[in-house]
Amino acid sequence: MTARRILVTSALPYANGQIHIGHLVEYIQTDIWVRFQRMMGNEVYYVGADDTHGTPVMLRAEKEGITPKALIDRVWTEHKRDFDSFLVSFDNYYSTDAEENRELCEKIYLALKAEDLIAEREVEQFYDPVKNMFLPDRFIKGECPKCGAKDQYGDSCEVCGTTYVPTDLKNPYSVVSGATPVRKSSAHYFFKLSDPRCESFLREWVADLAQPEAANKMQEWLGAEGEASTLSDWDISRDAPYFGFEIPGAPGKYFYVWLDAPIGYYASFKNLAQQRGIDFDAWVGPHSTAEQYHFIGKDILYFHTLFWPAMLRFSGYRTPTNVFAHGFLTVDGAKMSKSRGTFITAQSYIDTGMNPEWLRYYFAAKLNASMEDLDLNLDDFIARVNSDLIGKYVNIASRAAGFLVKRFDGKVDEAALAHPLLEQLREAAPQVAHLYESREYSKALRLVMELTDAVNAFVDTEKPWELAKDDGKRAALHAACSVSLEAFRLLTIYLKPVVPNVAAGVERFLNVAPLDWRAIDQQLSAASPVQPYQHLMTRVDAKQVDALLAANRESLQATAAPAAADAAAAIEPIADTITIDDFAKIDLRVAKIVECQKVEGSNKLLQLTLDLGEGRTRNVFSGIQSAYTPEQLVGKLTVVVANLAPRKMKFGVSEGMVLAASAADEKTAPGLYILEPHSGAVPGMRIG
């Protein structure tokens, strides 16, 4: 069979913060798939980079009193360390602030311009007179022009779901300085995504997307065929001061970070190609026969399934073979929380002495090919790792290896290896391979654990520890241990993409060459004696998990001073003082979320049915879809403004407002967080 040629990427982490376990879901998912492809003998390259440009990086560097270059170099070192610690096997880990990326950005931009897909338009924007800079959407807040909700971002209202341009905001203020912005006009450059050529191409391209959820979401964005296009042109420029690449022929104008970030995939691969003598153009040119896959979070699907493929198609490059999106990580059923210690950084996990392969295995045991969210239940984490990896898998080797080494000089009984159990394990190879290929890791590991149970049942039946007591059963002992260790070798092949360090230890102990998928048709040989058994993995101790949570709770206090320095970017100014009489007008009540569902036609709103202890339920729309799934909210208690006048919206009448917290700068502190009363509160209780 001809080897496939595959280019694989994960999304680029932003160079403005630490890697945490939520990030690691994606990199572990990608790495498992890449390692499997390598084991299959395919030519696969896995590339990544830090996403380094944009206003948040520029402002953070300014606050730290260093250059943006110094900041991104430091963060790159930290990110690379974390990926190495979790065995993420990039062939090249690079930076978007690289000459290869500058050249590719300019080349793609000029090609799109030659295709008449770049338009120049005057745009009126808010300008911070204190910082002397134009303000991106997320660096402006004010009152929603439709419902009047305060402290809404410059692009959409999280209360009523309305979208708008920043200049529509009432009483706007700069998140950077707190100043009232002024309006200024500026020439901006747009990628004409609304061009009929782009729409026609995207309708054709979406048909090949593997994930139904992604295809359905794209159909929503594209609208019904035959109707007027719902696609909007994309502003790809930003004004100075800005940390990024200047647009050729446009002094003082810079490529928007979301243009140069995905091009960074190609820049990283080009840098690798130069190192290894790979024909870059043969891999990424329009007639390439290679495959190209992007693993991403579902929150950036829009950029990877609309802008990115259209940019490539009309600038003379091949388009992605597919885009694989995953869901978000929760911990113990809730969003990661610094106060609870569940906002766990990659470095703290390693510093606590936790084994990275424990987390790799647990994530794999929960991951599938869908975009559904994944929950790290810490009690289940301890139980599953200790049961599956230690109690079932590693236990096989520890029960058989000692007898084989001591009694038979480590030499297997080759004649015994024609056992039906081993044939059963080999017959599962195509199914395990199919499940890895299709990213159904949880099903793959479930099947492998079923096979592991069968091997343990064989060991329990043969009882080598009993056979060893009877010299007359020496041959039976030899056969039982030989079959057990050959079965262990086969199971290791199936688990190697997930636990590569354990697999390397097994290869040393079994005295075999590095295991790939072809090794399934081979077997242990008496000519290569098994070596003395060495412990492959220790059990998870609950005290380690407790220490990990404590370390991350402490990190919140330890970083309080740096966080204060970032306050201008992350936390908006305190509102004007009010009297106690003003506050008394607001009736805050505890409410139970009885039902919850997504609002058709909106990617921001959830429709909640709330019980406020009134003998009836209320209908409330809330712009929290980016942070919660309906399943996560049903049954929870929350806090509602109960005496807010009902508001008629596009999707129905909203009879209140659910309270939620967020930072001003979601790059620095991403997320929305609903308020949850402590246990004991009941629907209808007043808060005051």
Curated annotation (Swiss-Prot):
It comes from the Bacteria. A motif ('HIGH' region) lies at residues 13-23. Its cofactor is Zn(2+). It is an enzyme of class 6 (ligase). Residues 582-688 form the tRNA-binding domain. It catalyses: tRNA(Met) + L-methionine + ATP = L-methionyl-tRNA(Met) + AMP + diphosphate. PANTHER family: METHIONINE--TRNA LIGASE, METHIONINE--TRNA LIGASE, CYTOPLASMIC. Homodimer. This is Methionine--tRNA ligase. It comes from Cupriavidus taiwanensis (strain DSM 17343 / BCRC 17206 / CCUG 44338 / CIP 107171 / LMG 19424 / R1) (Ralstonia taiwanensis (strain LMG 19424)). The lineage of its organism: Bacteria, Pseudomonadati, Pseudomonadota, Betaproteobacteria, Burkholderiales. The gene is metG.
